[in-house]
Curated annotation (Swiss-Prot):
Native source species: Rattus norvegicus
SMART domains cross-referenced by the UniProt entry: C2 (SM00239), PH (SM00233), PLCXc (SM00148), PLCYc (SM00149), SH2 (SM00252), SH3 (SM00326)
This protein's name: 1-phosphatidylinositol 4,5-bisphosphate phosphodiesterase gamma-2
Domain PI-PLC Y-box, residue spans: 930-1044
PANTHER family attached to this UniProt entry: 1-PHOSPHATIDYLINOSITOL 4,5-BISPHOSPHATE PHOSPHODIESTERASE GAMMA-2, PHOSPHOINOSITIDE-SPECIFIC PHOSPHOLIPASE C FAMILY PROTEIN
EC category name: hydrolase
GO biological process, one term: response to axon injury
InterPro entries cross-referenced by the UniProt entry: C2_dom (IPR000008), C2_domain_sf (IPR035892), EF-hand-dom_pair (IPR011992), PH-like_dom_sf (IPR011993), PH_domain (IPR001849), PI-PLC_fam (IPR001192), PLC-gamma (IPR016279), PLC-gamma_C-SH2 (IPR035023)
Active site feature: H327, H372
The record's account of how the chain is modified after translation: Phosphorylated on tyrosine residues by CSF1R. Phosphorylated on tyrosine residues by BTK and SYK; upon ligand-induced activation of a variety of growth factor receptors and immune system receptors. Phosphorylation leads to increased phospholipase activity.
Cofactor list: Ca(2+)
TM annotation in the entry: none
Highest rank taxon of the organism: Eukaryota
Length: 1265
């Protein structure tokens, strides 16, 4: 196998030679997961964009990957891509695989060179270039990004971009162009000629655009509190920041101690200077360069000292650490049908995870397999997993790895497991205690590069501690069934499970493998679906008008064309195209040859179809006596929707709603022409509700929302059939007369598919709770007489959500007055969602459940002859007269028998509990060879609820619900136990979607291994990633010393809590936010403190419309101050959302940090995607100030808290008096008086706190100046 050269020792000239070789390219064999046959391609490095590209021909790149996204370069034939092409023989030392991507499941590029020397060269070169890319300065990254934009529109890698291409690019990077005049004016400013920009001009255009959009942020440096005062900021070069000013800024505003060295300050400045003439002993930054620095990762909010490992912290007992832990590590997705993969183990281990789970089952040939038992998840070999663990366990972190074994294997296969552990892991496997007489766990340092087995262990007499209660429900009937769909008249596959005499089923499993065979389209019809085919255009003049309008808008490119049916000759067509500023027409003639229709423009060249003819002349020139020309851009047909079954030209809103209400399926839809306007509406069903969304016309485009542009309604529908339109709903069922007629025949089907019947309407449970209630996230002081003033935590009732970011509501004595919507959160919807969660809490399918059948209300019968082309069918016949039967089918007779017996036992009231117990009693044997490998992590179950007298050699595992119960009832006992013993907490079985629970309260009580689903990009996994970013991402973080104090209480009563710090945050702007779909983002930011319940708080900014490239909040956004009780155990979290066309928030990016690791000042917040992977150039700019609370100030903050609580009580009492007439009484005036007095007092307290902060900043700035 090829070994990688140590590139750090190579001299610079050798590195340059290697990079030059990669840039020239190498012909290699490319292995693909999607193609069974390897292909020869030229693979080369594009230095300007930092991308690896592969191509068949020089002018057409087939694919590329960003070098910054590379996670691993693996030598040899160590990927599945090579296994799929076993017939192709390549030496292992010529092969390697690049693993890359920003999701949990990585993409692969598997390559084979023709020589070992080439392989070594590429392995070394990629490592050199990856290091350079990861250390590149922000200006270098910007230049690379700009190159990518140019190359994305022209793969020839030319050094310029046209006005038309620029207009295309800007919406793709999240910026809405107001019109072509806006761009032309910008081109004049930068001196571009003839609507064409060189790369240097494109770079200048970018700099001017970003500066003009965000220059208002620099007003922050014109205030008295600033440590230096900026001059004119109207233009990028209007004023400058000089060396001494920059040093003062770094030292006193940013509190950067390294800035005491002027040489380091000078070096930092020169990275951001765009003109080498200014790289002198006294450099200066123009104001646009200073603004770029503020947004740069060099100015990050994260303190880099926490990227280093603190070896002094690694000598405590293992029980004193939080340990990064994974649940069901082998899965890449949900718990029902996702793929199991050894790569998932590798991904977790290389991400620093130190406790991984192996779910072991008996496999073929006497060798165990790993998968999620009784589900459709794929199976992987135990031996392969152990090999992967050995190879990757200590790449990222050298500290111990714990293997948590979920054992389901027979004794014989357990012996094989023990054999593989010993043979493969060798000296890495811990087989005896580090100290024979120790009374506590060893430290991570003592266990470096050791692998610990967590598994049941035989006692002195051969008995084993097995908790039968934990296992008794595990053997249940679950799996895939076909259900007969009476609407679509077909079988659909669902994941089903039986529990508590109920059969729960998931949504239908979309066919990904057994797709319907593609119907061959006759050659004469191939052109029907092409955008250039316009069918029968009214007249020649109409065709000319279409071409003229399109060319006027897009730049009049010769060869722009459309095809239409001939007005004069049957079976013939007309090709209309643009040449030299006018429209020309050619007749496409047809003729019969041997019974086959042929089409031609010239007699000597005929084609079998119109499609083939057009494709030919798009690649070859159309030659005439007067000219020769190649067809270029097609003019899209503006009205292809008129022939679609989902389109209705004359349909009112009410009629559309009536039609949709009769189709009880999410994803049912139609599009209708709106009356009296040149606009349309899409009416669809989602979450059981019928919704409408307007589609406007903008020139030839159709616009959904404000910035999702489509060439046609057909393109719009096609797009949203593949992508979510509303939340997770995609368009699936066109509402046609045939579908409505079929539904009328099956009118009772709603009783089965109306999923909302699973949930209880919140209004039925709590009718006294007013509708549309919101909760204040922060204090707000009215600035006008028609606005509300309220404190944090206030409940505002009867809210009217009006457009423009200002809502109306009732608070205290003020009725229907305005307040900013970003200061509140909607708790009505939150309560409903929480209720829904509680109702599905015990459902075996959890949130994936789409329906429940109560088996006590059905009789089960077999269909001996099968039904609807399925041989193995059983039917649930309702006991209630008039209800519809439900038909199920299986693929095998054995499955039919198992499901039939399970349901019949329930319907016959057979108690199977005793049988299950016996099943598990027969299966609790442990192989002594495997038992002997267990040293420190012996699970205990029988007495695990008793937390006294912990044994450091044991580990106690709790499902999240049990752990939550312990935390609520005896948090101190759990904390004391964890000071000596180990606990592991794992998600409940109902989390079949692989969602995660909140780990914070468990961390607070000292639980070391809080196992989460690493493959799920949710809030709690992001918090986990933030916690373990400490201590050099080793996977071990030492718990605060205060947690080991006898006086420490993880859940102290309110009287014992003290505010230790205030954190002031102001969101100023953002750059390069990611783009989700067709629409340009309308972003807003949520700032949240995550911690114990008393430390949790959040705040939202306003929404910026149609700008995800350079949004600004600085002029309107106020500073927000959070009170922190425990800075060691709290997180600062920035969430960036976009508000979609339905006013729903959609996640864009996040940044989550332990508060102890953040820095003060004007700081860049580099943004990450859901998987906590960096997003190129995406960042927020925030002002952040941390300030310890003095003892003299604690009384002031305590008074504020007490007043806020009292105001909440008074507000709710006043609301009852206002809404329930019979409750009015004499006490109301007293309540109003107390409410108003408290409100004034609270405002005075808050102003006093803010004044102290301002005085401190101003005095500091004067001192520094």
């Amino acid at each position: 196998m090829t070994t990688m050269v140590n590139v750090d020792t190579l001299p610079e000239y050798e590195k340059s030679q290697i990079k030059r070789a990669l840039e020239l390219g190498t012909v290699m064999t490319v292995f693909s997961a999607r193609k069974s046959t390897p292909e020869r391609r030229t693979v080369q490095m594009i230095m300007e964009t930092r991308q690896v590209a592969w191509s068949k021909t020089a002018d057409k790149i087939e694919g590329f990957l960003d070098i910054m996204e590379i996670k691993e370069i693996r030598p040899g034939k160590n990927s599945k891509d090579f296994e799929r092409a076993k017939a192709v023989r390549h030496k292992a030392d010529c092969c390697f695989t690049i693993f890359y991507g920003t999701q949990f499941v990585l993409s692969t590029l598997s390559l084979a060179t023709d020589s070992k020397e080439d392989a070594v060269k590429w392995l070394s070169g990629l490592k050199i270039l990856h290091q350079e890319a990861m250390n590149a300065s922000t200006p270098t990254m910007i230049e690379s990004w700009l190159r990518k934009q140019i190359y994305s529109v022209d793969q020839t890698r030319r050094n310029s971009i046209s006005l038309r291409e620029l207009k295309t690019i800007l919406p793709l990077v999240n910026f809405k162009v107001s019109g072509i005049k806006f761009l032309k004016d910008k081109l004049v400013e930068i001196g571009a000629q003839k609507d064409e920009l060189s790369f240097e001009q494109f770079h200048l255009f970018y700099k001017k655009l970003m500066f003009e959009q965000q220059k208002s942020i620099l007003d922050e440096f014109k205030k008295d509190s600033s440590v230096f005062i900026l001059g004119n900021t109207d233009r990028p070069d209007a004023s400058a920041v000089y060396l001494q000013d920059f040093q003062r800024f770094l030292l006193h505003e940013q509190q950067e101690l390294w800035a005491q060295d002027l040489n380091k300050v000078r070096e930092r400045m020169t990275k951001f200077i765009d003109d080498t003439m200014r790289e002198t002993a006294e450099p200066f930054l123009f104001v646009d360069e200073f603004l770029t620095y503020l947004f740069s990762r060099e100015n990050s909010i994260w303190d880099e000292k926490y990227d280093a490992v603190d070896m002094q912290d690694m000598n405590n007992p293992l029980s004193h650490y939080w340990i990064s832990s994974s649940h069901n590590t082998y899965l890449t997705g949900d718990q029902l049908r996702s793929e199991s993969s050894t790569e998932a183990y590798i991904r977790c281990l290389r991400a620093g995870c130190r406790c991984i789970e192996l779910d072991c089952w008996d496999g073929p040939d006497g060798k165990p397999i790993i998968y999620h038992g009784w589900t459709r998840t794929t199976k992987i070999k135990f031996d392969d997993v152990v090999q992967a663990i050995r190879d990757h366990a200590f790449v990222t972190s050298s500290f111990p790895v714990i293997l948590s074994i979920e054992e389901h294997c027979s004794v014989e296969q357990q012996r094989h497991m023990a054999k593989v552990f010993k043979e493969v892991l060798g000296d890495l496997l811990l087989t005896k205690p580090t100290e024979a007489s120790a009374d506590q766990l060893p430290s991570p340092s003592q266990l470096r590069e050791k692998i610990i087995i967590k598994h049941k262990k035989l006692g002195p007499r051969g008995d084993v501690d097995v908790n039968v209660e934990d296992k008794k429900d595990e053997h249940k009937t679950q799996g895939e069934l076909y259900m007969w769909d009476s609407i679509d008249q077909k079988w659909t596959r669902h994941y089903c499970a039986i529990a508590d005499a109920k059969l729960s089923f998931s949504d239908d499993i979309e066919q990904t493998v057994e797709e319907d065979p593609v119907q061959d389209t006759p050659p004469t019809e191939l052109h029907f679906g092409e955008k250039w085919f316009h069918k029968k255009v009214e007249s020649r003049t109409s065709a000319e008008k279409l071409l003229q309008e399109y060319c006027a808008e897009t730049g009049a490119k010769d060869g722009t064309f459309l095809v239409r049916e001939s007005e004069t000759f049957p079976n013939d067509y007309t090709l209309s195209f643009w040449r030299s500023g006018r429209v020309q027409h050619c007749r496409i003639r047809s003729t019969m040859e041997g019974g086959v229709m042929k089409y031609y423009l010239t007699d000597n060249l005929t084609f079998n179809s119109i499609y083939a003819l057009i494709q030919h002349y798009r690649e070859a020139h159309l030659r005439c006596a007067e000219f020769e020309l190649r067809l270029t851009d097609p003019v899209p047909n503006p009205n292809p929707h008129e022939s679609k079954p989902w389109y209705y030209d004359r349909l009112s809103r009410g009629e559309a709603e009536d039609m949709l209400m009769r189709i009880p399926r999410d994803g049912a839809f139609l599009i209708r022409k709106r009356e009296g306007t040149d606009s349309y509406a899409i009416t669809f069903r989602a979450r059981g509700k019928v919704k409408h969304c307007r589609i406007n016309r903008d020139g030839r485009h159709f616009v959904l929302g404000t910035s999702a542009y489509f060439e046609s309604l057909v393109e719009l529908v096609s797009y949203y059939e593949k992508h979510a339109l509303y939340r997770k709903m995609r368009l699936r069922y066109p509402v046609t007369p045939e579908l409505l007629e079929r539904y009328n025949m099956e009118r009772d089907i709603n009783s089965l598919y109306d999923v909302s019947r699973m949930y209880v309407d919140p209004s039925e449970i709590n009718p006294s709770m007013p509708q549309r209630t919101v909760k204040a996230l922060y204090d707000y002081k009215a600035k006008r007489s028609d606005e509300l003033t309220f404190c944090r935590g206030a409940l505002i009732h009867n809210v009217s959500k009006e457009p423009g970011g200002w809502w109306k509501g009732d608070y205290g004595t003020r009725i229907q007055q305005y307040f900013p919507s970003n200061y509140v959160e909607d708790i009505s919807a939150g309560d409903a969602e929480e209720m829904e969660k509680q109702i599905i809490e015990d459902n075996p399918l959890g949130s994936l459940c789409r329906g429940i059948l109560d088996l006590n209300t059905y009789n089960v019968v077999k269909a001996p002859q099968g039904k609807n082309q399925k041989a193995f069918v059983f039917i649930l016949e309702p006991k209630k007269q008039g209800d519809p039967p439900v038909e199920f089918a299986t693929d095998r007779v054995e499955e039919l028998f198992e499901w039939f017996q399970s349901i019949r036992e329930i319907t016959w009231k057979i108690d199977t509990k005793e049988n299950n117990m016996k099943y598990w009693e027969r299966n609790q044997s442990i192989a002594i060879e495997l038992s002997d490998l267990v040293v420190y992590c012996k699970p205990t179950s029988k007495t695990k609820d008793h937390l006294e007298n912990p044994d450091f050699r044991e580990i106690r595992s709790f499902v999240e619900t049990k752990a939550d119960s312990i935390v609520r009832q005896k948090p101190v006992d759990l904390l004391r136990y964890n000071q000596k013993g180990l606990t592991r907490v794992y998600p409940k079985g109902q989390r079949v979607d692989s969602s995660n629970y909140d780990p914070f309260r468990l961390w607070l009580c000292g639980s070391q291994m809080v196992a989460l689903n690493f493959q799920t990009p949710d809030k709690y996994m992001q918090m986990n990633h933030a916690l373990f970013s400490l201590n050099g991402r080793t996977g071990y973080v030492l718990q605060p010393e205060s947690m080991r104090s006898e006086k420490y209480d993880p859940m102290p009563p309110e009287s014992q809590r003290k505010i230790l710090m205030t954190l002031t945050v102001k969101v100023l702007g953002a750059r390069h936010l990611p783009k989700l779909g067709r629409s340009i983002a309308c972003p807003f930011v949520e700032v949240e403190i995550c911690g114990a319940e008393y430390d949790s708080n959040k705040f939202k900014t306003t929404v910026v419309n149609d700008n995800g490239l350079s949004p600004v909040w600085a002029p309107t956004q106020e500073k927000v101050t959070f009170e922190i009780y425990d800075p060691n155990l709290a997180f600062l979290r920035f969430l960036v959302y976009e508000e979609d066309m339905f006013s729903d928030p959609n996640f864009l990016a996040h940044a989550t940090y332990p508060i102890k690791g953040i820095k003060s000042g004007f700081r860049s917040v580099p943004l990450k995607n859901g998987y906590s992977e960096d997003i190129e150039l995406a960042s927020l700019l925030v002002f952040c100030e941390m300030r310890p609370v003095l003892e003299s100030e604690e009384e002031l903050y305590s008074s504020c808290r007490q007043l806020r609580r009292r105001q909440e009580e008074l507000n709710n009492q006043l609301f009852l008096y206002d809404t329930h007439q019979n409750l009015r009484g004499a006490n109301r005036d007293a309540l109003v008086k107390e409410f108003n007095v408290n409100e004034n007092q609270l405002r005075l307290y808050q102003e006093k706190c803010n004044r102290r902060l301002r005085e401190k900043r101003v005095s500091n700035s004067r001192f520094y100046s």
